[in-house]
Amino acid sequence: EGTVTEITATGIGAHASTPDVGNNALTGLLVFLGKLDFASCPQVDMVRKTASLFPHGDVNGKTLGVAMEDELSGNLTLSFNMLTVDAASMDGEFDGRIPVCGNDENVLEVVRARMAEQGLTLLNKALIPPHHVSADSYFLFSDRYEETIKTLYVDNNT
C-alpha cells in the first residue's frame, strides 16, 4: 500500500498508413495492464473494454468489424494512439486510413455501435471522407510537391 509503480512501454513507431511495420506501445501496454490483478473500478473496467476493441496487432479494424479494402486504396488501417485515464474520465484517440469504399455508415457507425456495446462513446460526428491521389499525380512528384508547398505556404504568406 502506498507504493507507486511506474511502467514505461516502448514501441516501434509507424505511420498510420502502415501500422503493421511498427509495434504499438499503447496496445501492448493495455495487454499487460489487462493481465494485472487490479480491483474492479470504472477506470480499470473501461481500459479492459477498450483493450478488447483494439487488441495488440489488429491494425486493420477486424475486431471492430470494419476491416475492408478496395483495389484502388488497399486495406483499411487503424492505430490506437492516445489514451488518457483519470479519476473522472477516459479519453482515447485512434487514427485510420480508410479506403475510398469506406464511409460513415460502414466505418464510423459500425465503430460507434461496437464501442457502445462496451459502454464507450465515440464522439466523432463524421469521418473525414477518404480520398485517393493517383500515383502519377502532378502533385506527388517531389519537385512539384516542393514547388506547390512553397507557393501555398511561403509565397502566399509573405
Task: Go through the PLM ranges and name each one.
Residues V111-L122:
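Transmembrane helical segments that form the transport core of multi-pass membrane transport proteins
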Residues T5-I7, L78, G92-F94:
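Hydrophobic residues positioned within well-ordered beta-strands of beta-sheet architectures
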Residues G13, S17-S89, R97-N106, T121-T158:
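An extended, acidic, His-containing surface patch that forms the Zn2+-binding/catalytic region
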Residues G2, M115, Y145-E147:
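A generic structural signal for well-ordered alpha-helical segments
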Residues E1, T5-G11:
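Internal metal/ion-chelating core segments
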Residues E1, L108-V111:
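N-terminal entry module detector
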